[in-house]
């Protein structure tokens, strides 16, 4: 059976972002991404800085480690990255998770399609705004969202500035029937000064709330902070 490149397995913790914010979950963080966002808070998944930490693991190995770490204290697993949608062989892992009664979630930027996405319970698609310096392939994104029709999906846009907010408005208008989340961006992913970081993030959150409540196009949007950053700062593995 083919192996999966894994950088981290951790939890139980709570999901800090998007449609399942606050959900108690275990995390599987895979290596590799087809993007290189300017402000990426998990650049170690693709920039080579953590290449010595990558483990090639079978789905059985991953499940065994989830249980070893989480015991009986979880029923939800989040697959994160990087971009886990780069990997073709996640379906075997999903089968094991389902056999053991797990609900599953994933976040991907909507740049790659895999048939196994249809097996995921909660799918967050997070297209990257202008501040990321990445370009959205809307034709590909259209196709992916169409294939996921009827699934429990959402769109999430991280917002750093006015240009990002304008991008978010256009995204929401393009897919008005897909639940939509605005989220504060963290542009200081290296600091260990948690008090300073929390103040910055809360100031940004207040700014984003003000933008949203004064924009009629965002009447149905939900505005979120980065919950995990407010609790743990930039700490990994939480």
From Swiss-Prot:
Function of the protein: Catalyzes the complex heterocyclic radical-mediated conversion of 6-carboxy-5,6,7,8-tetrahydropterin (CPH4) to 7-carboxy-7-deazaguanine (CDG), a step common to the biosynthetic pathways of all 7-deazapurine-containing compounds.
Name by which UniProt lists this protein: 7-carboxy-7-deazaguanine synthase
Cofactor(s) of this protein: [4Fe-4S] cluster; S-adenosyl-L-methionine; Mg(2+)
Pfam families: Fer4_12, Radical_SAM
Binding site for [4Fe-4S] cluster: 33, 37, 40
Residues annotated to bind S-adenosyl-L-methionine: 82, 126-128
Pathway: Purine metabolism; 7-cyano-7-deazaguanine biosynthesis
Enzyme Commission number(s) from the entry: 4.3.99.3
Keywords assigned by UniProt, alphabetized: 4Fe-4S, Iron, Iron-sulfur, Lyase, Magnesium, Metal-binding, Queuosine biosynthesis, S-adenosyl-L-methionine
SUPFAM superfamilies membership: Radical SAM enzymes (SSF102114)
Quaternary structure annotation from Swiss-Prot or TrEMBL: Homodimer.
Residue positions binding substrate: 14-16, 29, 80
Signal peptide: none
Binding annotation for Mg(2+): 42
Keyword Iron listed: yes
Residue ranges constituting the Radical SAM core domain according to the UniProt record: 20-234
Cited InterPro entries: 7-CO-7-deazaguanine_synth-like, Aldolase_TIM, Deazaguanine_synth, rSAM
Cofactor note: Binds 1 [4Fe-4S] cluster. The cluster is coordinated with 3 cysteines and an exchangeable S-adenosyl-L-methionine. Binds 1 S-adenosyl-L-methionine per subunit.
PANTHER family: 7-CARBOXY-7-DEAZAGUANINE SYNTHASE
Protein's UniProt keywords contain RNA-binding: no
Gene Ontology MF: a single term: carbon-nitrogen lyase activity
Reactions that this protein is recorded to catalyse: 6-carboxy-5,6,7,8-tetrahydropterin + H(+) = 7-carboxy-7-deazaguanine + NH4(+)
Family of this protein: Belongs to the radical SAM superfamily. 7-carboxy-7-deazaguanine synthase family.
Annotated source species: Bacillus cereus (strain ATCC 14579 / DSM 31 / CCUG 7414 / JCM 2152 / NBRC 15305 / NCIMB 9373 / NCTC 2599 / NRRL B-3711)
BP term (GO), one: queuosine biosynthetic process
């Amino acid at each position: 059976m083919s192996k999966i490149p894994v950088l981290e397995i951790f939890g139980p913790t709570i999901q800090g972002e998007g449609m399942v914010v606050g959900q108690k979950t275990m995390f599987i963080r895979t290596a590799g991404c087809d993007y290189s966002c300017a402000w990426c808070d998990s650049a170690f998944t693709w920039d080579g800085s953590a290449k010595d930490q990558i483990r090639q693991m079978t789905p059985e190995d991953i499940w065994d480690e989830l249980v070893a770490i989480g015991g009986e204290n979880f029923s939800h697993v989040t697959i994160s990255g990087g971009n886990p949608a780069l990997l073709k062989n996640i379906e075997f892992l999903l089968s094991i998770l389902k056999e053991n009664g797990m609900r599953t979630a994933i976040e991907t930027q909507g740049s790659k399609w895999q048939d196994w996405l249809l097996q995921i319970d909660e799918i967050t698609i997070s297209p990257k705004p202008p501040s990321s310096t990445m370009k959205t392939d809307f034709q590909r994104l259209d196709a992916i969202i169409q294939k996921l029709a009827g699934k429990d999906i959402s769109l999430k846009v991280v917002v750093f500035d006015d240009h990002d907010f304008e991008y978010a408005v256009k995204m929401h208008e393009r897919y008005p029937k897909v639940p939509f989340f605005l989220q504060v961006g963290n542009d200081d992913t290296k600091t260990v000064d948690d008090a300073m970081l929390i103040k910055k993030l809360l100031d940004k959150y207040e700014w984003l709330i003000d933008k949203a409540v004064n924009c009629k196009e965002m009447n149905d949007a939900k505005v979120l902070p980065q919950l995990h950053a407010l609790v743990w700062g930039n700490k990994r593995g939480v």
